Structures are given as C-alpha cells and as structure tokens.
C-alpha cells in the first residue's frame, strides 16, 4: 500500500476514489513517564517518554488507516493528515485520515 501526504502519487494516475479512510488510537499516559514529565517540566527539555509514546501511537493510527483502505480495495491513500486531541485527562487521541484511491 502506498500512502502519502501529497494529493497525487508521482508517475501514477488515480483511476478511482474509494473514499475517506481513518485510523485512530487513544493513548493514555504511563505513571513512570508522568513522573519524569513532571521533572522535565521543572528543568525544561524534551519529554522523550511522551515523544516515543506519540510516535508509536501515530504509527498505529497509520496502520489502521491503511487497513481501512485495503478493506475498500484501494492501492493507495493520498492527502494524509493527522490530528490530535485530548479525550480525557491523561489521554490523547491521534487520528490519521486520507483519501483511499485505486491507481492505474
């Protein structure tokens, strides 16, 4: 499966639009990461535990979006975007979405 943030795939032509596809994950904080985050917020700097957690969550969201596209018979997903939001205190949602297409 090809997926891209661009609206087209270079060297390929879109034959059919299959529809909007999504993949999301809600990730909660880990108490150990929370303690380190509290310390980092005092002294400043990147909170690596959260960065790694969000990277993993984004990858899961992409995988779920690609599975959604495959279920529609798509060859690719174009125009991929990401959003994040807080669901409840201590958890965040990452949503990946794009347009599933069939290529020539």
Swiss-Prot record:
<protein>
    <recommendedName>
        <fullName>UPF0145 protein VIBHAR_02090</fullName>
    </recommendedName>
</protein>
<dbReference type="InterPro" id="IPR002765">
    <property type="entry name" value="UPF0145_YbjQ-like"/>
</dbReference>
<dbReference type="Pfam" id="PF01906">
    <property type="entry name" value="YbjQ_1"/>
</dbReference>
<comment type="similarity">
    <text>Belongs to the UPF0145 family.</text>
</comment>
<dbReference type="InterPro" id="IPR035439">
    <property type="entry name" value="UPF0145_dom_sf"/>
</dbReference>
